[in-house]
Amino acid sequence: MVKLVCFLKRKEGLTLDEFYEHWLGRHAPLIRSTPELARHVRRYEQHKRVTEPAWCGTEGYDGITIQWFDSVDEFVAFTAEPKYSELIEPDEARFLDRDAFVWMITEEPIVAMDGPT
C-alpha cells in the first residue's frame, strides 16, 4: 500500500469557503462516481487546514489530500486513465493552484507511537 500526500492551495480569486465547497462537494464526488477512477483508489481523505492559531500549519496551503493505492503502479494507472485527463485535470484547474502543488508518494507508515505510553 502506498499513499499520495498532496498539499493543496486554492486558486487565486477563490475564498476559502469556495475552495472547500468545490473540493469537498464536487471534486471528491467526481472521483467517487467515476468507476474507471474509483477502482484504483483504496481510500481518499480530505483534511482541511486548522487556521487558528495561525502557526498551526504550512502557511499558504489550505488542505491536504491523502489517497491510498495498492502500489505505485496502481497510482500510475489511475493517472493514465482517460477519465483522469478528461474530468479530473480540468476540475483541478477550477479550484487549485496547480503551480503550488506539493506532493509525495509514501510507503506504509512506521508507527513510532500508538496512544499514550
Question: Model segments located where?
Answer:
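Macromolecular interaction modules
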Residues: M1-T117
